[in-house]
Amino acid sequence: MWINGGYFYFTVIHGQVKTHMNQSLLVTKRDGTTERINLDKLHRVLDWAAEGLNNVSISQVELRSHIQFYDGIKTSDIHETIIKAAADLISREAPDYQYLAARLAIFHLRKKAYGQFEPPALYDHVVKMVGLGKYDTHLLEDYTEEEFEQMNGFIDHWRDMNFSYAAVKQLEGKYLVQNRVTGEIYESAQFLYILVAACLFSGYPRETRLSYVKRFYDAVSTFKISLPTPIMSGVRTPTRQFSSCVLIECGDSLDSINATSSAIVKYVSQRAGIGINAGRIRALGSPIRGGEAFHTGCIPFYKHFQTAVKSCSQGGVRGGAATLFYPMWHLEVESLLVLKNNRGVEGNRVRHMDYGVQINKLMYTRLLKGQDITLFSPSDVPGLYDAFFADQDEFERLYTQYENDDSIRKQRVKAVDLFSLMMQERASTGRIYIQNVDHCNTHSPFDPAIAPVRQSNLCLEIALPTKPLYDVNDENGEIALCTLSAFNLGAIKSLSELEELAVLAVRALDALLDYQDYPIPAAKRGAMGRRTLGIGVINFAYWLAKNGKRYSDGSANNLTHQTFEAIQYYLMKASNELAKEQGACPWFNETTYAKGILPIDTYKKDLDAIVNEPLHLDWEALRESIKTHGLRNSTLSALMPSETSSQISNATNGIEPPRGPTSVA
């Protein structure tokens, strides 16, 4: 049979179809020369890639790929063809094709990066990459050639073969250092992991740092610790901004609005997702300068923020994205709730951001009692906006006072109508979120009287104090940053392993705060003062499954309690030990931890009705140590979504149940 310029014939041996093609085809090598196709060489590569895998057929991959070969085909195209052929065979019945495709892709990736399968020595690689401007020069300034040789001995390049195909595609697309214009890739995954470790611990004493580098490298390269996109794609490069979450609060002035917009552009361009608190902006028709002009309302300024968010990609790694927050009692709320839907016109829609509606107990109470919610412009009701977050009793007092003041502009809406509109938009767009601001302040580690939480981040897992910027260089404002990572519960055998992993994660991320740059002074002020971290989990679904538990029947409740008690305890213990060594964070006194209040004290006690698991760890000793020595970090845990970074570990994302078998082909 003649296909694509070559003769093929087929035989059946033991029920399997074998494909044979003549070897008259010419192939074009990477250096531009041509030679006859060597099918035996291809077969050897496939044989190597299939080693140890179950239920994979090399002949099936050969059959699917050979029929796509043509005279003059490039060797790189041959490799991509067999990778695609293997990936197309991934199924529930034969899942190991994902590893066959991944190994072939790793082989191809290394040939592109190094011109050969075997990676170079680490020191030689770093010297070359620093010379090209791809790696930060500090690597060669901070470490000697002998130390690089030691680190080279830590590397196990065979760990590349543990990636799934989906993971390799994520590495190629997002995480490996590359020229994002030409697509040229400069490294493979084990260099990524060892150099992230080297960068983060570069400031540690010379006599101990290589021990931390090795331990951290082993933890991340065996998928026990999962790193977020900004760290994986950025640490080791000259662009030093690795916080995943940036929370920016806007005031009610043009200077503040413009400063907020400038801060958004700075951080979006450096890999960060954005949370914007725009709740202070006054409503449409409000007087400006005593009535000299009237206000154009929130929507034009939301459009301004949207333009800033979309003006840059996140360092070329992902598109700019933001969630914008406003209170449910804002006078314009009925116009704001519909901003994302597909009805309306361009002038009254701002569709390319997500939205967080801020609610407290009073709003729910009005709903349950069938009462009205009164809407105000924040500029017309002094003290109400701040009390909404800091003091719920004071908020209710002011709210009812302003409701009864006929001189204040207001609008009454049936609570059921307002909640119905919100839930309708939430259901139809999937991107309207809810922030219960009273709970964020009563269950946070911050004292709301000193450091209230007034917003969240892009994905709503972070709750940190902020202060409005009135100028992009305003050092009195506060931009909140959160630096993330996660424990892969599927990769650990027992909860006791979390103690060492917590030490590594806390120390690495805390060191990162000193290692990274801060394009806005208000961000550096907040990061250095609070030293906030957010360490969560991935593969929770697998953790439950391998322990024989389910989401749906309550069987997982006690295991979940044990798991997250261990996580919280070991994280706090690690931060406490670090505080003994390097000092507590400067603004530790603004946390409830300074008063000896711990998460075991503030959780909602109704949980005791459904979970009867006791506490297993020595919290009282930890409490006393924290009161004495403090914590290095104001926050330590966060349940981030980890939508793409979890794919590197071939894990389910965050705490979410799997929605179905998935693959990338």
Please provide the spans of the model-predicted regions.
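Aromatic (phenylalanine/tyrosine) cluster motif
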Residues: Y7-F10
